[in-house]
A protein has these predicted regions:
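Glycine-rich phosphate-binding loop of ATP-dependent small-molecule kinases
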Residues: 1-210
Length: 210
């Protein structure tokens, strides 16, 4: 199954993607991770991306789409994948269509702005392996310690309320219009935020008919 996960920052896309890739046995493809991997591996589009990143510039859509196309051509993506964080704009969605990348469903996680602000204040990330946690919704077994690798859990600077509100403004302007874009293609599955991570996963699987 080829999926896109949509939703505002802090909606739990990363957490749900990790759960779904284990349940469905398909990889999660996040923009940040594949950009870093392409740069590290020195692929042609990775080198292009590195030039922009080193200059402190935004990586243009055509390079991002190139990196994604490169990643989706790998063997582990042939039975499906989950895209997290891309497309983030209508032009990116159109570019994916143009290069022939198709999807079975687009899941939009729905949650209010106020709940996002509260939720993101409780997020923690492992400084060593990047595993996500939350002080309330997904706490580690030992406070401040990563379950996976024993690394130190940290709050992110961009989870401060004023920063979150700015990011939400960008989301509503740039990314939220993708819901109409994919609804017009009969791909959109809307999933309301649930009280727990597990309940949200169940709602996603139900929306997908799984």
């Amino acid at each position: 199954m080829k999926l896109i996960l949509l939703g505002p920052p802090g909606a739990g896309k990363g957490t749900q993607a990790e759960i779904l890739n284990k349940k469905l046995n398909i990889p999660t493809i996040s923009t940040g991770n594949i950009l870093r991997a392409a740069v590290k591996n020195g692929t042609p589009v990775g080198l292009q991306a590195k030039a922009y990143m080193d200059a402190g510039k935004l990586v243009p859509d055509e390079v991002i789409i190139g990196v994604i196309s490169e990643r989706l051509a790998e063997a582990d993506c042939q039975n499906g994948f989950i895209l997290d964080g891309v497309p983030s704009t209508i032009p990116q969605a159109e570019a994916l269509e143009k290069v022939g990348i198709t999807f079975d469903a687009v899941v939009s996680l729905e949650i209010s702005d106020e709940e996002i602000v509260e939720r993101m204040g409780g997020r923690r990330v492992c400084a060593s392996c990047g595993a996500p946690f939350h002080v309330k919704n997904l706490p580690p077994k030992v406070e401040g310690v990563c379950d996976a690798c024993g690394g130190k859990l940290e709050a992110r600077a961009d989870d401060k309320p004023e920063v979150v509100r700015d990011r939400l403004k960008v989301y509503h302007k740039e990314t939220a219009p993708l819901k109409d874009f994919y609804a017009a293609r009969n791909l959109l599955k809307t999933v309301e935020n649930q009280p727990t991570v597990a309940e949200t996963t169940t709602a996603i699987l139900k929306a997908l008919g799984l």
